[in-house]
């Protein structure tokens, strides 16, 4: 019979890995609460139309990377490839525009993209993302970037750079796109096959290509900064002022773009300093037109997202110490059926008093139970045997200093509390 394994591009998160995941998730939530963000959870799947309208019909995400199927009613459904469009859909559906603006939300959830699996990149991956909807002021951009920076720094990832750019708005971007098309049309012979395809449907993405020949071309490509309207120039200038005010070490990168059509004005990424431009930990930007594209009123917004798997990869690479997960305080070993019943009762009593306890629940030898206790990392072992039952006592062993003593059964709670 063929062995069934996890699908390509996915990974089981085993107990031995959970300390990293708990560490990152908890710190993400704690950071969000410091900045006044509230958690939101949206469905794993949405109607496909949401991503076609929101992410962009011509994007590679929609064209090549989505997991899409018809459900039994014939509705086209897609496993979410990213978190921003679903949050914006929820913002509209639940009338959040009536709340004090900006509405500040965060999520920690899986996303699905059919991509070539590689180190730190999976077809199902976990994202931590934040969205601030309902404010155009560049100080909000600065706050989001500051929040992401403090998050990475707090985790221990200190050797990072912040890349920053403005890709303009609906008024000024068309002239920039035309300049890009004109420039690259003269150099199509040097473009990789993917960029030749992108030239007509998504010329911005040519600046983002990681192929060497395309990167060389990008160095001489037109700059978005030369095409910004006055409003976008002022917005970008103010943002840089606020980032300097917050002492954030940003670098302007004229080739920085994002892979989704909804981005406007500010775009940014965080990169490990030693790895170069192909290893972004996370990024984000403004999407001032997305709510309107989905049927709402014009509503400025900005967001940020980061892949948790990639964060953990960098934590391990930097050899950053992670707090261990809690282990049970007490292991209860026993000898005989009657002692087993007493062990069950005692374990229940300890748990009712918020003392974590485990027991073997099998017919292992005492030696095997002690090995299990040692492996579990418990601080104390309680042993119940025939003599202990007869005398209404237990044997208590401190696993740290190897001290052992006999105590009355009814003194256990007082001793452990």
What are these regions (language model features)?
Residues 1-372, 376-416:
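TRNA-recognition modules of translation machinery and tRNA-sensing kinases, especially anticodon-binding
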């Amino acid at each position: 019979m063929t062995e069934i394994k996890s699908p390509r591009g996915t990974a089981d998160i085993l107990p031995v890995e959970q300390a990293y995941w708990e560490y990152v998730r908890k710190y993400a939530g704690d950071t969000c609460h410091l900045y006044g963000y509230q958690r939101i959870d949206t469905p794993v799947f949405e109607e496909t139309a949401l991503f076609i309208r929101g992410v962009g019909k011509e994007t590679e995400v929609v064209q090549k990377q989505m997991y899409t199927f018809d459900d039994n009613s014939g509705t086209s459904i897609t496993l979410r490839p990213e978190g921003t469009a679903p949050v914006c859909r929820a913002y509209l559906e639940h009338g959040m525009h009536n709340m004090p603006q900006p509405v500040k939300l965060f999520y920690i959830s899986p996303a699905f993209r059919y991509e070539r699996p590689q180190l730190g990149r999976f077809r199902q991956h976990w994202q931590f993302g934040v969205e601030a909807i309902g404010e155009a002021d560049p100080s909000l951009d600065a706050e989001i970037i500051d929040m992401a920076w403090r998050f990475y720094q707090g985790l221990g990832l200190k050797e990072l750079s912040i890349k920053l750019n403005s890709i303009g708005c609906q008024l000024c971007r068309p002239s920039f796109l035309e300049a890009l098309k004109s420039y690259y049309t003269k150099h199509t012979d040097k473009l990789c096959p993917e960029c030749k395809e992108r030239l007509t449907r998504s010329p911005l993405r040519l600046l983002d290509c990681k192929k060497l020949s395309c990167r060389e071309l990008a160095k001489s490509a037109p700059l978005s900064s030369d095409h910004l309207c006055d409003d976008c120039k002022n917005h970008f200038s103010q943002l840089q002022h606020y980032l300097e005010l917050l002492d954030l070490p940003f670098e302007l990168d004229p080739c920085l773009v994002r892979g989704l059509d909804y981005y406007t004005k500010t775009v940014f990424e965080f990169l490990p300093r030693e790895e170069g431009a192909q290893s972004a930990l996370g990024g984000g930007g403004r999407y001032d037109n997305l709510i309107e594209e989905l049927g709402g009123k014009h509503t400025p917004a900005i967001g940020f997202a980061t892949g948790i798997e990639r964060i953990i990869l960098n934590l391990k690479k930097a050899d950053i110490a992670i707090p261990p997960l809690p282990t049970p305080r007490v292991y209860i070993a026993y000898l005989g059926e009657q002692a087993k019943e007493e062990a069950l009762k005692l374990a229940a009593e300890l748990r009712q008093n918020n003392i974590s306890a485990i027991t073997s629940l099998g017919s292992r030898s005492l030696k095997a139970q002690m090995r299990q206790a040692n492996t579990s990392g418990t601080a104390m072992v309680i042993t119940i045997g025939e003599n202990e039952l007869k005398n209404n006592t237990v044997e208590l062993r401190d696993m740290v200093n190897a001290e052992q003593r006999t105590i009355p059964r009814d003194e256990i709670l007082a001793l452990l509390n």
